[in-house]
Structures are given as structure tokens and as C-alpha cells.
């Protein structure tokens, strides 16, 4: 087992990474101080890992309940969030009840938001079961739900007590979900660590094959990088925004097609292709680096051309992105691997990128 720490002073917490961790009682025990636990999971994950988690919690002598939600990005909304509150109130959960998010990014985001809101804040633990959630969404305290007009527009910054990333859970991931997680790994290397990006290029096939050593290193290094960024800028006042490379175009794709049509990581992968194209057009990135990024995204079996939503629709959706200010779109662009720039771009350059990178 590897442990990476997120250094946030009194709110610091560990990220435990390894195989078989869902069943290890001792990893949960220090973070559950109340008399009850509510597991939040979904219809896909509960049959796979719910019993193992409940068995791990049983020796603690707590009252354990489970809320099972429908699976998918399409359910990341108010109605589904209320199902969590229904379960907590039915079980008479109190301020010391610990929520445990067992699932991917949707479950983690909604459970964290519910924890932030219920009785104005109760503790929660992240148990991410997808590659994307292990390398990205479970770390850093971003929680929330979608709105029809924009992704993740309603939420809170609320840190977990711990993240328990069991890479054994990645063996049951569908291929599309695995590729979606590799997209966030690629993003992390591209924005923050050129040496890690080189490693990803050399090992993308090993990740596709789910080789345990490759997956463990990808999760570890991605978490180390994200932990350092979050420690420096917890609430995205500046530096943390670089983690949104590919997300401005990507969120527009997700909202434009309808949430769940493309997986989040698929949209981010394509969004990176689009952002790299724009980076070249603005004279920030060299063409050879753009081609390297495109090639590794394609090698991860991710889409490299966006849907034809139309220029006006893309611009409309990107203007409601969380990074936008006074309607001005801000892009995270690459200067070189490991070096980014947050900037606006002329509409003409954006239109040229859309013409080149969409169907």
C-alpha cells in the first residue's frame, strides 16, 4: 500500500492506494467516530463491492445503512441528491454520522455535497472505484451536482476524512470507463510533469491492459500532483484552475450532448485535443507537442474529434463555464508539457479550432 497525504493543516487527510483496500477495517476505523455510517453507492457498484465494504465496517460495531442510487451522469442532479437526504433522515443520521462514497466520480461528488449540506456538515470518506475518480475527482474536496445549463455549477468545497483507492476495483471497469480515467492521467502529466507525460506515452498500452504496476504508478503520481496543487490553492483561486485543462471544451461537449452521452473523461480527452489546437494557433505550443498529445489520447482509445454542436452552441456553453468572468471565456492552454497559461482567446481562433477538431 502507498499513502499520499493532502496537506491542508487541520483538515489534512491520507490517500491510501493499493489492491484489496476496500476490505481493510483498519483503514476506515480512525475516520469513523460516531455511532452510524451511511454508505452511498449505485446499482452497478453495490453488487460488486458493497458486501466487502459492509464486512469491513462490521467489526467497528456501528449501525450501517446503505443508499443505492441509479448509475450514471444523467442522475447527478437535485432529485438524486434528495434520495441521499431521504436515507439519512430515515435512519435518523446525526452530526457524527459518517458517509462513505463507494463508486465513481458521480457518487463521490454527490456524497460529498450531501455531507457538506446535511446538518451543515458531516464527515465523509471517499472509496473511489473508477480510475477517473481515483486519480482526480475523489481528491481535493470539489463536490456538487449538474444543472441543465452547466456542469458542476451547484456544489461546495468540502474535504473528505480519507480517500481509500482500491486499484483492485479497476479490474471490473468497462473499457470506456478505464479510458476515461486514463484521460485524466494524461491531463495531469501534460499540465504539471513533463517526465510523467513521457512515462504515460511509454506505458499507455500497459494502462490499457490494466497492468497493476502501471495503474498503481499512474494513481500514485496523479494523486501526488493533485495533492500538491490542492494544498497550494484549495479553492481554485489561481493555480488549481490548471487542473481544468481540456475541461472548458469538454464540459461544453457534455452539456451540449446531454449528460451521460459521453463520459466525462471522454469529453476531457477530446477537450485536450481542442485546447492543444488552440494553443498552437495562439503561438503558445509547438506543433510537435500537439501531435504527441493527440497521439497518446488516441492510443488511450479516447475520441479526438468533438461533436458538431455548432460554433454558437459551443460558445454559449463555454460562457457558463465556472472559469468564465463577465461572460468572457477563459481557457487553460499549454505552453509546453508541464507549463500552462490561463487566458482568453479571440473568437476567430476558437472558431478555427472548432472547424479543425469537430465533425
Swiss-Prot record:
Catalytic activity: 7-phospho-2-dehydro-3-deoxy-D-arabino-heptonate = 3-dehydroquinate + phosphate
Localization annotation: Cytoplasm
Stored SUPFAM superfamilies: Dehydroquinate synthase-like
Residues annotated for Zn(2+) binding in this entry: 184, 247, 264
CDD domains from the UniProt entry: DHQS (cd08195)
UniProt keyword list: Amino-acid biosynthesis, Aromatic amino acid biosynthesis, Cobalt, Cytoplasm, Lyase, Metal-binding, NAD, Nucleotide-binding, Zinc
Family: Belongs to the sugar phosphate cyclases superfamily. Dehydroquinate synthase family.
NCBIfam families registered for this protein in UniProt: aroB
Stated name of the protein: 3-dehydroquinate synthase
